[in-house]
């Protein structure tokens, strides 16, 4: 779809004072006029409306210069665009000069922002490319450009300047990274010096610790020798007790597992049963109710459509009746036309016969005069008598004919009066109907306008949210990138296994999700077990372990799902659930797929989540506990806690990635909402525009009807005046006829006298001759009477035809009104059919939903039956395990009694050995060893006990800085590669644009001049090269553009500009005196090419050359009177001087 400028309306803009309207057409529009008349101000109008950023673009020093002098403090310009499908778009800019100049933009009369203008133009298929406006001076600028300036021009055209800001940003990043590298290197040097000092102190402390340990080992060996004998006696009994304990624990675990599984199945069964109740009592009933409601609405709409169709049939019958009456009237008019033609033909034949008879009579009478005896006197008197007779006869006939014509005119006027009165009543009815339609349409437009701006407010709100979310995503992606760089080695190894072996599912931590509130609790409770790898089966685990061995990768823990035991039934937490600090079983706060339950249980076990460390202290001793802050309470009594940097580990990276995915889903949803609202906005805008268009059409129709009614009233008044005038004229004619009849009576007496005198004369002439004259006279009178009769009949038939034509016009108007009603009802039927289709589609969706719910009901019922079967099997296994446990406990009690006796003997030795934890037994002379160790300790002198930890901390710190240095080097390298890539991309885009323009320029120059022209790049690097223009005019040598004549330079520059226009086409072009320096040959070739292009894009050309107008589809003249510009549309006679 393409659009064009239909008209420009300016008020007090520059030299166009008051209101000026300029009309344009598609194709080539030529503007001409004397220099200084204001032609170029038309281009300034377009730039002003389109919101040019520079005041100098519209050839003004300040905004107040745009207002016509002496015209107040305000000016405005509106441009009407028309699309191929008939839509119109009016963009207006008003400038008010107050304390500060203010501009207001309007789209179709609605206040808008400048930023919305481009979107609105794009919706009409209107775009402006490079060189859409070629103003005075653009050609000379190109000719005078240096090679560097031409290159920069091509850079702007190609758009490569967009790369410059990115390249500068990357360079700034490189400088910042380099500065950070220098600072980091200085710190590394200082830390290396400190590390060497700590290394010496650490080695000294290690020697001291080794001596102390050896001394304690000697003491420990002396005690241990006393203990060994007693322990050998005890081991046998403990082994037996241990075996029994393991067997009992296994049986207890099996029983507990069966109880938990049984309870879990029972809970799942209750949940499924509840879901069945919810499904049957809630959602299915709602869907059935909604389906019934939609079916009722469909039936209602069908009834309305049937009623509308019956109305359509009635209207069609009315139209058929009007068409029949119109056809009958047309046949009668055709018959009258044939009668008029026959009567006119008969009248012309009679007039011809009358002329022939009159000529014969005159000939005979002349002979009679010639043959008279008293030639001189008799001829004179007979001629005088005859002229008087003829004159009286004609006068009488003319008076009678005038009277008859006036009576016929009066009849026509009376018929016309009746038709006008009927037409006036019809127009009054149409005006009232149109006013009602205008009110209804205006209300619709208000409704659509409110809807549009409500949607627009939502659209702006969502757009702002999208912008904010995109910023948040960018920040989150940057953080995620940093976090991803800290992914541990084992994670990358798991990724490698996933790619190498089918059946590797992933880390346990990757298969679970939980809220931010529970991060510390889950990470502490799971610990390293969260890094276990879940695989499909033990065969996959075997294959993975072999790969790790082959590649010398550290061991990993694998969890084959086919070998993992189901988690035991949940233990009864008892009274601790009533404690205010108790939160629940930790696994209940973690989300995962049920197939991975055994793997998740391996990591988290049956750990209980509590509020804080105080709650843990109250509840510790029976269950494993974890606080929200990550502190662990072991059933054996140990407490593990302290600071953890959870945010920096792999879990944090996963959560960040998860949050990022959620934000992207939210962004996608928002963008879908924005697209939907945009479609609704477009629909509302279309409805608003349609209502506005209908209102405009109705207002135009109202105006037209009012004007037509006014014309009818004036015409009726004129007819009444004509009737009165005709009545008076008829009365005057009657009076004149009466007077003439008296004169005729007198003239008849005179005629008898003349006749007697003639008879005396004729007695002396041949009687037969005068008989012929008398016969001719009688025949002439008869023909004259017949002519008058035919003329009277012709007038009557013509009057009847005029009356029938007026009746036919009235029938046509009634038919048009009826068809408009028919079209309105048809549109309503289309809308109702659309609503019916929407409801039918909605009913289908409800039916599909109902079918899906019934399927879900069947599946849930099957799950309940299966759960009942599993529960029975679990109860049987629990009873068997209890019996075995009782038997094992009896055996173990007997062994414990024996072990108690030995434990008492060893207790004193154990208390003594407890102070030597970590010591090892030695072999040799223990006394000599002790003396040697004590001397060595004295020789070491002062010891820094914190040296080992300080050394490790310093070593880790140095390693962190060295890794940071490596990352900075990698970052710098990546940034340098990015800079090179951007420069290469910029170079590619520039070279392609340069080549395309050069080829098109040569093509255009060949059409205009017949020669060749191209661009030449001077320099090895396109981005720093100089661009020259090489031209070979037809039949001339090749030279640079600077060496050409003025006209030849213009041809070359125009070729370049036209080449850019071809590559980056626009809907509309404005060319201001681009042919100024061209000779006739080149100017004509140029205008031919422009006129051909005008078939695809509207072109507005300002020119003073006469040959341009022979190619124009529209000519516009501009003249100036006392500094005020006037515009005239039309066709010129071929020269600009002819412009008004």
UniProtKB/Swiss-Prot annotation:
It is found in: Cytoplasm. It holds the Pfam family SMC_N. Residues 502-619 form the SMC hinge domain. GO terms for molecular function: ATP binding; ATP hydrolysis activity; DNA binding. The keyword Cytoplasm applies. ATP binds at residues 34-41. Its main location: cytoplasm. Signal peptide: none annotated. One of its GO terms (biological process) is DNA replication. Keywords: ATP-binding, Coiled coil, Cytoplasm, DNA-binding, Nucleotide-binding. Belongs to the SMC family. Homodimer. Required for chromosome condensation and partitioning. This is Chromosome partition protein Smc. It comes from Thermoplasma acidophilum (strain ATCC 25905 / DSM 1728 / JCM 9062 / NBRC 15155 / AMRC-C165). The lineage of its organism: Archaea, Methanobacteriati, Thermoplasmatota, Thermoplasmata, Thermoplasmatales. The gene is smc.
